[in-house]
Structures are given as C-alpha cells and as structure tokens.
Amino acid sequence: MNAADISRAPPGYLEVAWIADTCKLLMGLGWTTNYAGMIYKSLKDRTYGMALMPLCCNFAWELTYAVIYPFGSRQDKFTHYFGLMLNCGVMYTAVKNAEREWTHAPLVRRNLPFIFIICIAAWTTAHLALALQIGPSHAQAFSAYGCQLLLSVGALCQLLSRGSSRGASYFLW
C-alpha cells in the first residue's frame, strides 16, 4: 500500500525503503497465513471465523483494490488478487456455515444471502466513495485501517455473542 509516490522521496528514505517493503511482505504473509488458517478452522469447526460485517467489509476492500482500482507494482497487484482469492475461501465458509450460527435469530437466518449481498454492496460503495473523495491510493490505506478496526471489534463481539471460541484459535488471534 503506497499512499505516496516514493520516487519523489528524499534520498534518506530511499536508503531504508527496504524496511517498508519487508514490512509489507510480512503483512502479506501474515494475512495469507491467517486466511488459510481461518478457512481450515472454519471447515473443521463447521462455522465461520470472521464476523459477518467485517468479512463483508474486508471482501469489498479486496474487491475494490484488486479489481476496480488495481495499482502498484506487479507484486502489489498479485498480492491483492491472491488476497481476494483467499478471501473468497473465507467467504465460502461463512456462507456455507452461517445458518448454523443463527438458529437463535430466524429472521437473520432466513435472509443471510440477502444480508451478504447488501453488506458487500454497501461496503464496496463506501470504499468507492472514499476513493472518489481522497483518491484511490490514500483511500486504500485509510479504509484498510477502518477494516482492521472493524475486524478487531467484530472478533471480540463474535466471541462474546457465541460464548465460545468456535471458529477461532490462538493461531488466528
């Protein structure tokens, strides 16, 4: 996620740019590991590992910056496409297993496909609106922070509402 053109960066930054690149690589490896672990744990526990609202927000972010506003190096584009593909796996486990988690709320349970579609469309619209307001490169970074905050809060809410750690593990946390 480059929110600025580093070709115009001061020479002092260019000398240590490898640190930022290494951090981006580690972040990509972390997300890849987390997505793969989440898919595995979700299939094993027959539930989903990421709360629905953050999942839809994150999926919309991946869709927005892999398909609608792809930019950066080939490595950046590949990372976004790969993240989107893994996120499809996370989304699959959620769609497949969500009904089991919503037996206490029949209205939600009956409307889960509609809820997924509306949430993804709404979050995609939000990401696009932010990109139009401040530009895609800045919006990519800022909306990622928002997604991460929503993901953290959603994980805690999911843990509290389930009353157990089904779908989660120390590895994923």
UniProtKB/Swiss-Prot annotation:
InterPro entries: PaxB-like (IPR039020). Its EC number is 4.2.3.-. One of its GO terms (biological process) is terpenoid biosynthetic process. One of its GO terms (molecular function) is lyase activity. Keywords: Lyase, Membrane, Transmembrane, Transmembrane helix. One of its GO terms (cellular component) is membrane. Induction: The subglutinol cluster is highly expressed when mycelia and hyphae are transferred to fresh media for a 3 hour induction period, remaining expressed under conditions of heat shock. The cluster is repressed in cultures reaching stationary phase or in early germinating cultures, as well as under conditions of UV, salt and oxidative stress. The chain crosses the membrane at residues 11-31, 51-71, 112-132, 141-161. The keyword Membrane applies. Belongs to the paxB family. This is Terpene cyclase subB.
